């Protein structure tokens, strides 16, 4: 659930292929000793690993090793942090409640428009994602392929309304979901990130912004 930032695999082509097949890798760095010759007993397909077609690769020589660093997905870190910081700030506008988290959200469209929302902004049963999505729809926005930034992991089940935020996000066809803090199991067991990933949504987590989310929810304790 928490994810792996870096993973070192030695002679593990099958492991690398597994991560690539699941779409779980952003960057692959491959180091090969050009002086090393494998015998027939070690030259089977399980030891071969090819970088996916279309990957942007940078090659260099380090200490006699041929190193290729290949980017499999575009680097969206700066944009993600900008929108996610805005979402965290939106969460601070929420009126604290003993029965819900204070969360902020931003819907970012490919055309550059964005829409914000925070928990209970217009209704005592609305979550932040609902508020931001409603504003986007009211403006006539097409949400398929858009990104949504939430200070906390989108809920996967809830008691106040029949549709969870995860279901709402999937129904509207969002391509990316970015958040700072996994939802604690205080009210329900949240499996939003897992459900979204299994549905093919690109999910990114930036825990370096999680402290701001904790501050917004200090009324609930740690």
Where are these regions (language model features)?
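Enzymes that bind and transform nitrogen-containing heteroaromatic metabolites
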Residues: 1-85, 89-94, 98, 136
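Short, basic and Ser/Thr-rich N-terminal targeting/leader segments
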Residues: 99-103, 126
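Short beta-strand scaffold segments in enzyme catalytic cores
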Residues: 68, 102-111
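Short beta-strand segments
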Residues: 10, 104, 151
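Residues that mark the start of a beta-strand
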Residues: 4-6, 102, 147
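Phosphate/diphosphate-binding glycine-rich loops and adjacent basic-rich segments that engage nucleotide
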Residues: 219-222
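Anionic group-transfer/hydrolysis microenvironments
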Residues: 12, 106, 118
């Amino acid at each position: 659930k928490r994810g792996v930032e870096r993973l070192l695999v030695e002679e593990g082509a099958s492991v690398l292929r597994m991560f690539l097949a699941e779409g779980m890798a952003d960057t692959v760095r491959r180091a090969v000793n050009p002086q090393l010759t494998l015998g027939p007993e070690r030259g089977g397909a399980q030891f071969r690993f090819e970088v996916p077609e279309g990957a942007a690769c940078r090659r260099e020589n380090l200490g006699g090793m041929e190193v290729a660093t290949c980017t499999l997905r575009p680097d969206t870190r700066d944009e993600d942090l900008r929108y996610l910081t805005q979402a965290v700030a939106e969460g601070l506008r929420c009126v604290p409640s003993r029965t819900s988290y204070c969360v902020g959200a931003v819907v970012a469209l490919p055309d550059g428009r964005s829409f914000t929302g925070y928990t209970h902004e217009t209704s005592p049963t609305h979550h932040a994602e609902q508020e931001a999505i409603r504003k986007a729809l009211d403006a006539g926005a097409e949400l398929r392929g858009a990104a949504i930034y939430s200070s906390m992991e989108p809920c996967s089940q809830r008691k106040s309304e029949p549709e969870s935020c995860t279901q709402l996000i999937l129904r509207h066809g969002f391509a990316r979901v970015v958040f700072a803090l996994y939802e604690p199991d205080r009210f329900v067991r949240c499996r939003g990130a897992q459900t979204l990933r299994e549905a093919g949504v690109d999910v990114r987590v930036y825990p370096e912004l999680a402290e701001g989310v904790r501050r917004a929810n200090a009324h609930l304790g740690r």
